[in-house]
UniProtKB/Swiss-Prot annotation:
Species assigned in the record: Abutilon mosaic virus (isolate West India)
Cofactor(s) the record lists: Mg(2+); Mn(2+)
Primary localization: host cell
GO MF annotation terms: ATP binding; DNA binding; endodeoxyribonuclease activity, producing 5'-phosphomonoesters; helicase activity; metal ion binding; nucleotidyltransferase activity; structural molecule activity
Domain comment (free text): There are 3 rolling circle replication (RCR) motifs. RCR-2 is probably involved in metal coordination. RCR-3 is required for phosphodiester bond cleavage for initiation of RCR.
Protein name: Replication-associated protein
Ranges spanned by the short sequence motif RCR-2, renumbered to the chain: 57-59
Function: Essential for the replication of viral ssDNA. The closed circular ssDNA genome is first converted to a superhelical dsDNA. Rep binds a specific region at the genome origin of replication. It introduces an endonucleolytic nick within the conserved sequence 5'-TAATATTAC-3' in the intergenic region of the genome present in all geminiviruses, thereby initiating the rolling circle replication (RCR). Following cleavage, binds covalently to the 5'-phosphate of DNA as a tyrosyl ester. The cleavage gives rise to a free 3'-OH that serves as a primer for the cellular DNA polymerase.
Pfam families associated with the record: Gemini_AL1, Gemini_AL1_M
Residues that, per the record, bind ATP: E221, G222, D223, S224, R225, T226, G227, K228
Domain CRESS-DNA virus Rep endonuclease: 8-116
Amino acid sequence: MPPPKKFRVQAKNYFLTYPQCSLTKDEALSQLQNLETPVNKKFIKICRELHENGEPHLHVLIQFEGKYQCTNNRFFDLVSPTRSAHFHPNIQGAKSSSDVKSYIDKDGDTAEWGEFQIDGRSARGGQQTANDSYAKALNAGDVQSALNILKEEQPKDYVLQNHNIRSNLERIFAKAPEPWVPRFPLSSFTAVPEEMQEWADDYFGSGSAARPDRPLSLIVEGDSRTGKTMWARALGPHNYLSGHLDFNGRVYSNEVEYNVIDDVAPHYLKLKHWKELLGAQKDWQSNCKYGKPVQIKGGIPAIVLCNPGEGSSYKEYLDKEENTGLRNWTLKNAIFITLTAPLYQEGTQAGQEEGH
């Protein structure tokens, strides 16, 4: 009769199952952390489940820095802190650490320690089809969750294509900017110049079908604290571009009625998208952020807000001889307004609180 086969498991990843174990997951985690092993432990994850009969059991994944050889089948036994009871596990080497981790995660009642180690040989670390992994990433709900899935299941792509993957996921999961809620109603602005009010009435007073194909834009120049920003932002759904242009999907929407361009230096706008924005041009691309081109739907006017003075005033900038051609084009595509007084009356709520 052959001698009984000696117990021996040699693996970097261990999958333990404790049937009928009354310990909490935190009690078990503490005991497993304190086990002395010749190979450093890197990650422990525990799930506590209830059988149909109500009896609890634990599933555990332990990852070591290198292969750990276990020849004592009682090594991973746990001890009850309140009574004389030992809990003995079924011990297996885990070929796919990711599969075990996914299995443990399924019920959600988990505890963990350390950082999960990606295993390139696991079914989720290279052999799983890319389509499965990317479909799972698309269903993850947010950028970071999707990245975590691809890091685990497609580590090669995650390392070599990280920038492109992150950029694509940020665009896919981008949420439309929250609608801006004006602090003051339009009725607060009782001193709007007639030509400026006519522009607003002509554009916002008609439905989208009745608006011109390329509506005129508006350039408003005036001192600080005249109410021009609050007025412009109270007219309807808009994009607010302040100081620079950013067409990232997290801050810019193609589903608004107009753009507000505030304190953007005229020489900067000339270098970027002067004619596209002020000319209400349709279907153009931008790569202002040195990333992949962003498709802009366009077809909406811009309200440009600026202060007087060198470097800020659009009128002064266009009056320069080298900008004659741009000035002639702009006069055909925008209305210029120069404010000589605030757009509100002193004593109104807007007059008391206007800060720009």
